[in-house]
């Protein structure tokens, strides 16, 4: 499993436009610029890859890191900085499986999977949304994956456990969570 952190910045990127906090000032002084959260996971055994979350910086991230377009996507929650890059797949993929949690969020009365289907219906069969139960492992790209609930109010948010069943290598990550995991 080869993991590429495409973006690790804040919701608005780091540094944030117009922000004078210590983090943003230090980033400017050091010439550091971080795009929003997204992770590329390549299964070197199968040659397939998956993308964790679709940052609005999708295009720039893929150009900067020279990684393959994903064979599948995973969406952890519906905040714009984790989902709104999904529209970038238009003309790039066909039938991309996009796995998302099926648990209904009381704040929205929809699951992440339902929100993607509604919000990105214009993508037609460019994507295929796959609703997944939290804690229920599933296979994609030759990897075993499961969504795990994490605390990130006010919306339901999920972390991931990704396991290479052949080697036992394990990746656990969450894009957003509070300190109370």
Q: What role is predicted for each listed range?
A:
Residues 1-180:
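Binuclear metal-dependent hydrolase catalytic cores
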